[in-house]
Amino acid sequence: MTKKTIAKYALCALAIGLALFGTARAQAQNLVIGGKNFTEQLLLSDMTAQYLRAKGYDTELKNGLGTTLMRSALESGQLDIVWDYTGTALIVYNHIEDKLDPDQIYQKVKELDAPRGLTWLNESELNNTYAFAMPRELAEKYHIRSLQDLADRINEDDKEGGKPHLMGVDYEFASRPDGLGPMQALYGFRLDRSEVKQMDPGLVYTALKNEQLFVGLTYASDGRIKGFDLQLLEDDKGYFAAYKATPVVRQEVLEKNPRLAEQLNELAAKIDTATMTELNKRVDIDQEPVAKVAADFLKQAGLI
């Protein structure tokens, strides 16, 4: 083979290499991933950044944001990808308080956000909805597994002149139109005002742990439920809206990255409430770093 031929092949190889590099960089444009300011959101945003980096993307993480700030940043193009909750989008962003089933909520928010250039990908099985919880020993002692069981116990004790049933809720839930009052009406029980203790959400968990409350308002995937050995009560009449965690991406970003939707859907398919509760516990109770917990999950799920 002559030097001229070798040079010719070398130039061809260089051209192919540059073309392939250019293709890789086109996919690997910088993706800005946003997250809210609580543990679950820090985990979701961090695991998304690590996962996409392993797929060849450049990523920038901007988490620790409030709900409305994150939403505004997504709409204005300052963020490319976030994880948001279907119930939040329905009630907070779109001010719809109709009682819809989980699939109806998902379809509604997806439809409403499409004209805004935002695409809701496949929802995960992580439902971080409101939930009432009890100390497990108390729940087992009184055979309470659901909100209807709770209502029946309260009504039975009231007839017998039993002791008060202290319920801990946050300040908003106690008074809002889709809060405590309508829930009591649906399940057919009524607590006296003195039995309803309004407090910071974080204090509810501590009070439940110490059995200072009979029951308290929590979030279904909070790590403290497992860490403090609390019993979640089934919402057997479907009072609370679903808050399914879902990747939301700007449509422009999806168009520039043809495989991104499929890749994020693959991640979403691996996440459910039980899994996230355990991950949240590792951060909040066991004090493990968010980045480590996120990386462990991705490896165990076979995603990286």
Locations of regions flagged by a protein language model:
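Extracytoplasmic "Venus flytrap"
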Residues: 30-48, 65-67, 172-175
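Short, polar/charged alpha-helical segment
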Residues: 39-58, 181-185
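An extracytoplasmic/periplasmic, membrane-proximal ligand-sensing/linker region
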Residues: 40, 172-189, 258-304
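Beta->alpha turn/N-cap motifs
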Residues: 63-67, 77-89, 105, 201, ...
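Ligand-binding "clamshell"
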Residues: 93-121, 210-212, 224-238
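A conserved helix-loop-strand patch within extracytoplasmic ligand-binding domains
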Residues: 104-166, 269-273
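A bilobed periplasmic-binding-protein/Venus flytrap-type ligand-binding module shared by bacterial periplasmic
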Residues: 130-140, 244-257
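Ligand-binding pocket segment of bilobal, Venus flytrap-like solute-binding proteins
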Residues: 160-235
